[in-house]
A protein has these predicted regions:
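Bacterial N-terminal signal peptides
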Residues: 8-16
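Short acidic/proline- and small/hydrophobic-mixed sequence motifs that coincide with surface turns
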Residues: 59-64, 76-79, 164-167, 181-182
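Sec-dependent signal peptide cleavage junction
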Residues: 15-29
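Terminal connector regions
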Residues: 107-152, 207-232
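Intrinsically disordered, low-complexity Pro/Gly/Ser/Thr-rich segments with frequent PxxP/GP/PP motifs
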Residues: 78-111, 184-211
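Positively charged n-region of N-terminal signal peptides that target proteins for export
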Residues: 1-5
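Asparagine-centered strand-capping/turn motif at beta-strand->loop junctions
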Residues: 53-59, 157-161
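Short, solvent-exposed loop/turn segments enriched in Ser/Thr/Gly
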Residues: 44-51, 147-154
């Protein structure tokens, strides 16, 4: 009887270990911040936050809409926090290896007197979200720093779906010659239909204060990565 009980306990233990291992090994999405930039506009109470996030997990998933920014000064004092920071578009679905961009305008009086020296951004995967279809596109930069109103990115794409597209979002990320993320702009277009097979070009401008920041810091955008999303 004792031997039977001992064998039963060993069997139960083995089953529990197998279940625990299976649960631990279950594939899941993991959202990783691979690049980011915080721009503190001087004496303006404004800032810009840009990031590239990637699904580095082994399963597809959505990006949570509750990302968190924590910005600190040179002494490590927290200047500001921002919650509910999401991708563009919101709660996007990513397969393993796929990426999306984050573009957040920040308004906070603390930026009038304090300068951001360090910025930490965290965002998780979620079980629910939105699914979009991505359309192939081409993008070109027009950059003339001496001309304040003549700096932009043209993004061209073709409607390869079977329906007229009335709602779509364009995201353009600018990089320098070293592959450093400099700036992201987005454009949500609604109510202008693109017929199946038709091609359209959307212009996204580089803000004047971003241009001044580039000139002040000696930065030059040389390449652009554009993503075009439409609702499924």
């Amino acid at each position: 009887m004792k031997r039977f009980i001992a064998m039963l306990l060993m069997l139960c233990s083995a089953l529990l270990m197998t279940a625990a291992f299976a649960e631990e090994a279950a594939p899941e999405a993991k959202i990783t911040v691979v690049e980011q930039r915080f721009i503190n506009m001087e004496d303006d109470g404004r800032g810009f936050f840009f990031a590239k996030v990637q699904n580095t997990g082994d399963a597809a998933g959505y990006v949570d809409y509750k990302g968190n920014i924590v910005a600190s000064d040179a002494e490590g004092n927290i200047i500001l926090t921002e919650n509910y920071v999401s991708t563009a578009p919101d709660e996007v679905y990513l397969e393993p290896g796929e990426y999306a961009y984050v573009c957040e305008n920040i308004y906070d009086d603390a930026l009038d007197t304090a300068e951001v020296a360090d910025c930490k951004f965290s965002i998780r995967a979620a079980d629910d979200g939105e699914e979009y279809e991505k359309l192939a596109s081409e993008a070109k930069i027009h950059y003339e720093p001496d001309e304040e109103d003549d700096n932009y990115v043209d993004v061209t794409f073709t409607n390869t779906t079977d329906e007229i597209l009335y709602d779509y979002e364009i995201v353009a990320a600018l990089y320098d010659q070293n592959g450093e993320l400099l700036f992201i702009n987005t454009e949500v277009v609604s109510g202008i239909g693109v017929h199946p097979g038709s091609t359209i070009t959307v212009r996204l401008y580089i803000y004047e204060d971003i241009l001044m920041y580039f000139c002040r810091e000696g930065l030059t955008p040389t390449t652009v990565d554009a993503l075009v999303y439409c609702e499924k």
